[in-house]
């Protein structure tokens, strides 16, 4: 990979990993509501699911041109529906002022999010088909970059969770408003799948 292409790869992957999306918003919300330590199950579920999805993207990238457009469209609708459900859960979750301490979303729920998270699927397919496959089709490179993509994504999730933890007091003071804003951002993510 040339230095120019490598620079573009890092720019694309880091910006994509750090911008708002279902994972980052969920990480922020969980750490704000429950603290960083309580959110490690959520982060672990995201990370494992992210890795598996990136490996699946590696396989899909080889044959992307022949994928049935109806299947891709169906995946988009499933992803949007799950993201809207997640937005509803965040918008209606109790805040500290409500006097209730809801449990964070489970490992398996955050794991399952990855398989309908169109942002990370597109992230993986785009990075692999744009930066890796034109340079090499060696399986070791494709798998290695897939693992790297998952690590970069996990880094973004942890950064957002740490922000939620560090600003927890402020976020808890304005918990209801924060939950509404995060839910609206998730709705925006769902709409952006189609437009």
Curated annotation (Swiss-Prot):
Pfam families on file: LysE
Location of the protein in the cell: Cell inner membrane
GO biological process: cysteine export across plasma membrane
Membrane topology (UniProt): Multi-pass membrane protein
Residue ranges annotated as Periplasmic topological domain: 1-7, 68-69, 126-141, 195
Chain ranges on the Cytoplasmic side, renumbered to this chain: 29-46, 91-104, 163-176
Keywords, in A-Z order: Amino-acid transport, Cell inner membrane, Cell membrane, Membrane, Transmembrane, Transmembrane helix, Transport
UniProt similarity note: Belongs to the Rht family.
Protein name in the entry: Cysteine/O-acetylserine efflux protein
Species in which this protein is naturally found: Escherichia coli O139:H28 (strain E24377A / ETEC)
Lineage: Bacteria, Pseudomonadati, Pseudomonadota, Gammaproteobacteria, Enterobacterales
């Amino acid at each position: 990979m040339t230095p120019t292409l490598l620079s573009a790869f890092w720019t694309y992957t880091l910006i994509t990993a750090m911008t708002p999306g279902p994972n980052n918003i969920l990480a922020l919300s969980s750490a704000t509501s429950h603290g960083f330590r309580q959110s490690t199950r959520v982060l672990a579920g995201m990370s494992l699911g992210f890795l598996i999805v990136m490996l699946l993207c590696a396989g899909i990238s080889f044959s992307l041109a022949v994928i049935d457009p109806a299947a891709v469209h169906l995946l988009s609708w499933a992803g949007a529906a799950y993201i809207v459900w997640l937005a509803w859960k965040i918008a209606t979750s109790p805040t500290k002022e409500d006097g209730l301490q809801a449990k964070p979303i489970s490992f398996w729920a955050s794991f399952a999010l990855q398989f309908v998270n169109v942002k990370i699927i597109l992230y993986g397919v785009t990075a692999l088909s744009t930066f890796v496959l034109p340079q090499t089709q060696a399986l070791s490179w494709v798998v290695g970059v897939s693992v790297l993509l998952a690590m970069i994504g996990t880094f973004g999730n942890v950064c957002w969770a740490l922000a939620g933890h560090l600003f927890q007091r402020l976020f808890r003071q304005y918990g209801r408003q924060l939950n509404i804003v995060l839910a609206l951002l998730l709705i925006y993510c769902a709409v952006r799948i189609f437009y």
